[in-house]
Swiss-Prot record:
Listed GO MF terms: double-stranded DNA binding; single-stranded RNA binding
Protein name according to UniProt: Nucleoid-associated protein PA14_59050
Gene Ontology CC entries for this record: bacterial nucleoid; cytoplasm
Subcellular localization(s) per the UniProt record: Cytoplasm, Nucleoid
Amino acid sequence: MPIKHAIVHLIEKKPDGTPAVLHARDAELGDSQAIENLLADLNESYNAKNKAWGFFQGESGAYPFSGWLGEYLEGDRDFVGFSREAVEHLQKLMEESNLSTGGHVLFAHYQQGMTDYLAIALLHHSEGVAVNESLEVTPSRHLDLGQLHLAARINISEWRNNKQSKQYISFIKGKGGRKVSDYFRDFIGCQEGVDSPSETRTLLKAFSDFVESEDMAEEQAREKTETLVDYATSQARIGEPMTLDALSELMDDQQPRAFYDYIRNKDYGLSPEIPADKRTLNQFRRFTGRAEGLSISFEAHLLGSRIEYDEERDTLQISSLPTQLRDQLKRRKAQIGE
């Protein structure tokens, strides 16, 4: 993962309305194993988060970031100057948001395969302990990437080469609610263009319709379900969208266009590339439910075979019980009989 440019600035800010203080670095970070490890760990943490996808708002006084980025890429300003302009804008937006807290702001322009990316993340420290050379336990501070809540990644290659794209920016959807992350999204100037959960649900609906139209046997349907979910999960893990072309080929190498053509002919309105939503995928793979001391969870493909749902009676009928459960029930029945 070649790193072309990287820099870190510090914004000191508390969520109490006090002014934000910027400590700007005046030179890029040099090449080192430490920065490579940081970026690798950052990407791993970022890829595991739930994200939204979108594209740049039209450049304006309210959304100047894309203009600065374009100037940097065209060579009209250097990376340090671009990052300084951007972090000063972020500082201003932080001061306007009473919910925001400061942190170290990382800008990293790197290449993965043939694709250029710009990663921007607000990093925080955590207090821990370490053992020093004298074998004494001492306080230790480290960047806590597990608490990564505000970060974005821009696919520079997609932005510059595909003007119609609406999903070349991804950013973390904050757990604290939309208001907490609003200022960071506005800092990037990102407009959400793809509803990942909705697109994923539509894809899964199209898949279910396709399986039904092909009148597949249960085992074949289960295998194709696993293929879809495994592919979607692996793409989500590396932070890349699914492509309908690739998915269709994985579904049937003998008829690699079958699923793709089915989707297009039925006009589901799906984008060629779909960011996978992990929560929606998990719900598709398993049915789960809890209520009043009862917990049920089973794989989706068992519905209609070992598990039957009667909607009118509001009941589930389960056949071929797990051995452990069956033994427990037998023992309990014997105890009651005594």
